[in-house]
Amino acid sequence: MDSLQTAQMVSLSAELGSNNLELAEPEEPGTSAAAGQSAAHPEEVTPEGSQALGAQEPEQSLPLAVPTPLECKVLLTQADALASEGHLREALEVYRQLSERQQLVAEQLEQLVRCLADSVPQEELASDSSGTSSCCAAALKEAGEAAAVAPEVWDGFKCKKCHGFLSDPVSLWCGHTFCKLCLERGRAADRRCALCGVKLSALMAASGRARGPRRAGQPAPLQLRVNVVLSGLLGKLFPGPARASQLRHEGNRLFREHQVEAALLKYNEAVRLAPNDHLLYSNRSQIYFTLESHEDALHDAEIACKLRPMGFKAHFRKAQALATLGKVKEALKEFLYCVSLDGKNKSARSEAQRENLELPHCSNQEGAAAAEESSSLANSAQGKVSSKEDRKKDQEGEDRDAASVRTGKCQEKKRNRCQIETQEDTELPNKVSKQDFPAEQGAKPDLSNPLGSFDASDLECSLCMRLFYEPVTTPCGHTFCLKCLERCLDHNAKCPLCKDVLLQCLPSRKYSKNVILEELIATFLPEEFKERKRLYEEEMEELSNLNKNVPIFVCTMAYPTVPCPLHIFEPCYRLMIRRCIETGTRQFGMCLGDPVKGFVEYGCILEIRNVQFFSDGRSVVDSIGKRRFKVLHQGQRDGYNTADIEYIEDQKVQGDDCAELMGLHNCVYEQASSWFHSLKASLKNRILNHFGPMPEKDEDPQVNPNGPAWCWWTLAVLPLESRAQLPFLAMRSLKDRLNGIRRILAFISRNQN
């Protein structure tokens, strides 16, 4: 909306003869005033007046004309524009004028609710979101005393979907862990990881767990297995919260089956076992609300907000209870909190709009106080920086049935109970910060105390018998070190413990580390983790040495600059290739086999360019020759050969010898090129497909320490046995190598003729 349109609408609203009121100025910091009264403008409030915003009424006002739909539409557009631009105080005045001309509906206040919610500072949500009313003091005290002696649960042991204690933890192939029942809720096709957003069907298919009979067009049933290590550890460290989490899921099931009283009993027992769990209080509040015990529902919602100030559902259920009890102002504020936490939630927006409409239906005194509360929100909004931080979306993933909003029932009871309050309307009591509860009843529990009952032996890999390093949980629920699991899969595509088939894990070779276990070890076993990491880094450093213990592939002849595709199927070479990639060298040696020594004395270093894995664990490696070497000492490591080596290079010549070498180089190149072009077309195509085209002639044949590339290409395609080619690899004289190639080409040409 441009300035001209705004000016026209302001002018039009003035012509309507409305009873314009000025909003009270915000209080100066440090001043205090009675409810509905400003210290700077005490004359702005008249006890018997009907001014909703506490402003002074003009002495004379024109009689209101019958508004037309166009006039009301202009006023609504003007109010929405002011609210969108951040001028909430002016927008509230225009909304009030509009309410005097027509009966507002909830949908017309959507923009106002959105802007009011945006004006709620994040600091207020964190520290001012769970006020302690007198009716809830006893419940807070009781919960605080119980929570003060309860063990504090590490945040890593909480499900990131329901934000409660992990119950039957299932670790997905992406590395994230959730409650089993949380993953099983909802339509199978829509289930996703709450952290990375990957569909569960894709994760299960990648891990081979989505199996079983199914109808045409239906997704495969998900087979979720509990993480054995994590489940046992949670049961050992936190037996109370673990049992409470099970009771919570049982209570949710009973609630869905409309056995509300039985569900309440389950939750009462769960709260006794885990008084620190905000989710228990939040869900029990919903149960109380269903049983029409609204005071108890408010009690539990207050405690849930206290334990988790940024929890959406706790605030929503608190607002739900307040609205039913007729506390319109407090309910509106809580609904605004909800919209601020999750602006996309339609229920929260519609309830906030409806509560805004309910303000005029209450007493004049309450309406004035509520309007002043909205005005204070507007003042705080205008003092904020325009580029506010992104809101943190905090939707607990509990069952939608347990979180359903009985809107009509709530509104009906609220209207019946909305009455004039005789006492003076004061501000809500100051809300205590999160650290005051439950610590106000005693010292906050030490996180290390419950976790001190386990040691590194609880987190040992069953394969290497050492502390987990880069732990990976298989779809069958067992956990191993990443390197240990990969080595086992080289030999057999089954879980080392339960023998469950893990065939689908092989093609991608992408393993995600278990986030919870990795953070747990790094946080609570720092010294053991540091030592384990040191051992791993020493192993990697040793494997990356390209002079000592260099991995040797005993197979065929390889030459510098010449491609060498390999088919890898033996377990020892699977491990060797993977280590070459992991260390970053991507290099290994290639030697011919020897019946006496194991492999010959000379070979060539190959560099891995690409690897393609197959579903059965085999792979095709695209490699190319780099440098020649001589074996000094042979050895073995984990089933494959190794060697200490030294690299060899051609000896350079100068002067007349260099000129003679240049002439010989050009002559042999022309001879090799003529021989290649004389071959049959089918044979030439096979050579080109396997080795590529013949390299160009070098201007300086000695620029490369291994000699010209075309020499090695020619040796690779010549019809010679590997044993006959080996001496060329060991030669350190380019002249001798060129003379040898010339003699072979001459011999082949004579035989062809």
Swiss-Prot record:
Q: Where is the composition biased (Low complexity)?
A: 363-382
Q: Which domain of life is it from?
A: Eukaryota
Q: Where are the TPR repeats?
A: 72-105, 244-277, 279-311, 313-345
Q: Which residues form a coiled coil?
A: none
| Residues in RING-type zinc fingers | 159-197, 461-499
Q: Where is this region: Disordered?
A: 17-57, 351-450
- A Gene Ontology molecular function term of the record: zinc ion binding
Q: Write down the InterPro entries for this protein, in alphabetical order.
A: Lon_prtase_N, Lon_prtase_N_sf, PUA-like_sf, TPR-like_helical_dom_sf, TPR_rpt, Znf_C3HC4_RING-type, Znf_RING, Znf_RING/FYVE/PHD
User: What residues does the Lon N-terminal domain cover?
Assistant: 540-749
Q: Does the keyword Zinc apply?
A: yes
Q: Which UniProt keywords apply?
A: Metal-binding, Repeat, TPR repeat, Zinc, Zinc-finger
Q: Which GO terms describe its cellular component?
A: cytoplasm
Protein name as annotated: LON peptidase N-terminal domain and RING finger protein 3
Query: Which species does the entry assign this protein to?
Result: Mus musculus (Mouse)
Encoding gene (name) = Lonrf3
